[in-house]
């Protein structure tokens, strides 16, 4: 009743208060971000910034050289030559600036999110509890690790912490953007609270778990702003490839001049620099950083924060998904629907024992048992706090049981309720022998996709015995089978993790369409499965929210922790889902794959379009010496100068044209790697060959029409 009353009041409170902030989707060219990116493009011309990108550093050096050559020859050259030299130098500068603009646009989206988050991180007064039990009001900036604070309805939680006392409805819209309030309470996996969120009802006592400057919001700001961004292994490898190609083309251009001089047609520095810049992979070199930053930003748009680009890349390479059954594959509101007694025991007796054993069970299933016993048999829920003769045994993932030890006149009566295998073992360990009838009931419920919880008791004067079974029902989510079919087409193996017995797990696994399942799983089993998969050369992704999930989250290549989870879980994972939706793991993998596909597609396009620029510049450079080279002028460009200038201008403009694709990402489809490769080679490989021929010709026509050439 208390929970129902609190949820009602929370809903009413939420109705009157709109969310203050959400990690909202922004348009691709948000005017505010564009205005911020323009000056950043100029600041990024600093050599120390350009040094991180070897390709663009070469372009920058080329722009400086051509500018100096233009200024040197300004007085001695003809007007036409000066226009040519000036335009080449200008568009080399534009090439660098466009690359800087792409990176600044990607960074700007994160900085806009960070600016909004800083509004949440405001100084508040906290009611700190002293060692003597008194309350003192202190600024939130003075709170230390393990301080204890009291937060009442209407007050802002001053810092990250764990609830150690009480239950409350909390408005987390400042973090998640979700206006509906959530329940936070002491104990279990819903005890973590975040600084900057607001208590809507009741009162809680919170133990501070974060040092100043290391709160969840501080880490969010650092992540979305890119302060913690480092190059990923794939980016480093691609940079090495691009640097190698740049060196090869640099050597080719340097050695070309002696041959040209020997042939009697030495080339000017401006022409040689133009050739070099057009041949090196400037397109992907200009967009590489933006692609990586935009990939992390797409996660932010889905309310997922990654600790690094490495985590996003790993998501794209994942080939095993570990998915918890409850809440991910099924709706997660598994409810008790029936008490099934064995012969000689009444259903009411089973309900009474099941309810007693569930009083300390804070899981949704445990609470549903208490409610069902009350509804079916009028058994009033007893408050564990006033049962002085009882010692409650809480549910844990390790024991997979909960229960109570009652001090009665005849002795100690011990009641246990939980997973069939765990309770059966408990019965055998205490002298009992589970009957075939219990096994038949368990198998019948399991084969129908339900979850059986066995109820057993043991008194001092007799052996332990099973007295009945609680039938829990859950529903597989609509459309989840189709999502798993998509994963299978991408050669991703799906494994369902559940605490259910093998029969129940098998029935649900078949209905959902997963490739495999792990039944009666403990945290140790989950960790062992991850290690086995990794030893086989597979990358593993999983979700978790509890402290017992922390080792597995840390071991997994992609560990997505729920924002509603414990502090330990959030620190162990390399991603945090602000919506606490386990199903989102599938979307995380798709975003990771989209990042890798985008990078590969634009790399293919960048290298392929060098062919057209080769056909434009090489004939133009030497057609005077070797007229036969005019046959290579397949685009029928107007003159050698217009050919070189057209290639340089196109080389700069194509970067601008591809910025939306770099930020938005290549369209993702669930298909096999070979099909994906064929499609991208056709679109971006063939496109990289054809588009430059058309683009350079169009630029040439414009140059001629303007009388520049």
From Swiss-Prot:
Subcellular location(s) of the protein: Cell membrane
Coiled coil: none
One CC-aspect GO term: potassium:proton antiporter complex
Descriptive protein name: Potassium-transporting ATPase ATP-binding subunit
Catalytic function, reaction form: K(+)(out) + ATP + H2O = K(+)(in) + ADP + phosphate + H(+)
Membrane topology: Multi-pass membrane protein
Residues annotated as binding Mg(2+): 545, 549
GO molecular function, a single term: magnesium ion binding
Enzyme Commission identifier(s): 7.2.2.6
Keywords: ATP-binding, Cell membrane, Ion transport, Magnesium, Membrane, Metal-binding, Nucleotide-binding, Phosphoprotein, Potassium, Potassium transport, Translocase, Transmembrane, Transmembrane helix, Transport
Species: Mycobacterium tuberculosis (strain ATCC 25618 / H37Rv)
Family matches, as InterPro entries: ATPase_P-typ_cyto_dom_N (IPR023299), ATPase_P-typ_P_site (IPR018303), ATPase_P-typ_TM_dom_sf (IPR023298), ATPase_P-typ_transduc_dom_A_sf (IPR008250), HAD-like_sf (IPR036412), HAD_sf (IPR023214), P-type_ATPase_bsu_IA (IPR006391), P_typ_ATPase (IPR001757)
Family recorded in the similarity comment: Belongs to the cation transport ATPase (P-type) (TC 3.A.3) family. Type IA subfamily.
General function of this protein: Part of the high-affinity ATP-driven potassium transport (or Kdp) system, which catalyzes the hydrolysis of ATP coupled with the electrogenic transport of potassium into the cytoplasm. This subunit is responsible for energy coupling to the transport system and for the release of the potassium ions to the cytoplasm.
PROSITE patterns, alphabetized: ATPASE_E1_E2
Pfam families the record matches: E1-E2_ATPase (PF00122), Hydrolase (PF00702)
Active site: 324
SUPFAM superfamilies, sorted: Calcium ATPase, transduction domain A (SSF81653), Calcium ATPase, transmembrane domain M (SSF81665), HAD-like (SSF56784)
Subunit structure comment from the entry: The system is composed of three essential subunits: KdpA, KdpB and KdpC.
């Amino acid at each position: 009743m208390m929970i129902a009353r609190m949820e009602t009041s929370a809903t009413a409170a939420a109705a009157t208060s709109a969310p203050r902030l959400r990690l909202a989707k922004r348009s691709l060219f948000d005017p505010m971000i564009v205005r911020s990116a323009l000056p950043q493009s100029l600041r990024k011309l600093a050599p120390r910034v350009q040094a991180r990108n070897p390709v663009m550093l070469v372009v920058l050096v080329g722009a400086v050289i051509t500018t100096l050559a233009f200024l040197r020859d300004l007085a001695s050259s003809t007007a036409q030559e000066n226009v040519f030299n000036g335009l080449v130098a200008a568009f080399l500068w534009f090439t660098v600036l466009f690359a800087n603009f792409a990176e600044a646009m990607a960074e700007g989206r994160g900085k806009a999110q960070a600016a909004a988050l800083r509004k949440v991180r405001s100084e508040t007064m906290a009611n700190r509890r002293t060692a003597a039990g008194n309350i003192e009001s202190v600024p939130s900036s003075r709170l230390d690790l393990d301080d204890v604070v009291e937060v009442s309805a209407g007050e802002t939680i001053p810092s990250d912490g764990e609830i150690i006392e009480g239950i409350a409805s909390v408005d987390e819209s400042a973090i998640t953007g979700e206006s509906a309030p959530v329940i936070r309470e002491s104990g279990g996996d819903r005890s973590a609270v975040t600084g900057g969120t607001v208590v809507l009802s009741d009162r809680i006592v919170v133990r501070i778990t974060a040092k100043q400057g290391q709160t969840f919001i501080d880490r969010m700001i650092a992540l979305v702003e890119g302060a913690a961004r480092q190059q990923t292994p794939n980016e480093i490898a691609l940079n090495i490839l691009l640097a190698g190609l740049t060196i090869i083309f640099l050597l080719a251009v340097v050695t070309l001049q002696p041959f040209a001089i020997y042939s009697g047609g030495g080339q000017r520095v401006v022409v040689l620099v133009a050739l070099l810049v057009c041949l090196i992979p400037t397109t992907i070199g200009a967009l590489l950083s933006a692609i990586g930053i935009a990939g992390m930003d797409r996660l932010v748009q889905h309310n997922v924060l990654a600790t690094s680009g490495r985590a996003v890349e790993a998501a794209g390479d994942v080939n095993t998904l570990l998915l918890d059954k409850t809440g991910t594959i099924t709706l997660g509101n598994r409810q008790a629907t029936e008490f099934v007694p064995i012969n000689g025991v009444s259903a009411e007796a089973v309900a009474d024992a099941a309810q007693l054993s569930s009083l300390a069970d804070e899981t949704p299933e445990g609470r549903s048992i208490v409610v069902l016993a009350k509804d079916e048999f009028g058994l009033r829920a007893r408050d564990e706090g006033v049962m002085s003769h009882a010692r409650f045994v809480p549910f844990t993932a390790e024991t997979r049981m909960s229960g109570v030890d009652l001090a009665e006149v005849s002795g100690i009566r011990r009641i246990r309720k939980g997973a069939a295998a765990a309770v059966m073992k408990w019965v055998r360990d205490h002298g009992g022998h589970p009957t075939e009838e219990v096994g038949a009931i368990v198998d019948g419920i399991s084969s129908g996709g339900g979850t059986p919880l066995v109820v057993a008791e043991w008194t001092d004067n007799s052996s332990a015995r099973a007295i009945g079974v609680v039938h829990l029902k859950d529903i597989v989510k609509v459309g989840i089978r189709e999502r798993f079919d998509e994963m299978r087409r991408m050669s991703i193996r799906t494994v369902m993790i559940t605490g259910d017995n093998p029969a129940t797990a098998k029935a649900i696994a078949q209905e959902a369409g997963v490739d495999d399942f792990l039944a009666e799983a403990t945290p140790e089993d989950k960790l062992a499965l991850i290690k086995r998969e990794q030893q086989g050369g597979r990358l593993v992704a999983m979700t978790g929210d509890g402290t017992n999930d922390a080792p597995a989250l840390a071991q997994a290549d992609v560990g997505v922790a729920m924002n509603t989870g414990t502090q330990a879980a959030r620190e162990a994972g390399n991603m945090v889902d602000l919506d606490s939706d386990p199903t989102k793991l599938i979307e995380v993998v798709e975003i990771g794959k989209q990042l890798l596909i985008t990078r590969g597609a634009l790399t293919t396009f960048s290298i392929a379009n060098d062919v057209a620029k080769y056909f434009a510049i090489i004939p133009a450079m030497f057609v005077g010496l070797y007229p036969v080279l005019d046959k290579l002028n397949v685009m029928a460009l107007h003159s050698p100068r217009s050919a070189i200038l057209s290639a340089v201008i196109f080389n700069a403009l194509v970067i601008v044209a591809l910025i939306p694709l770099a930020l938005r990402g290549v369209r993702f489809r669930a298909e096999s790697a070979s099909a994906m490769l064929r499609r991208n080679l056709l679109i971006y490989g063939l496109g990289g060959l054809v588009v430059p021929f058309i683009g350079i010709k169009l630029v040439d026509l414009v140059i001629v029409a303007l009388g520049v050439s």
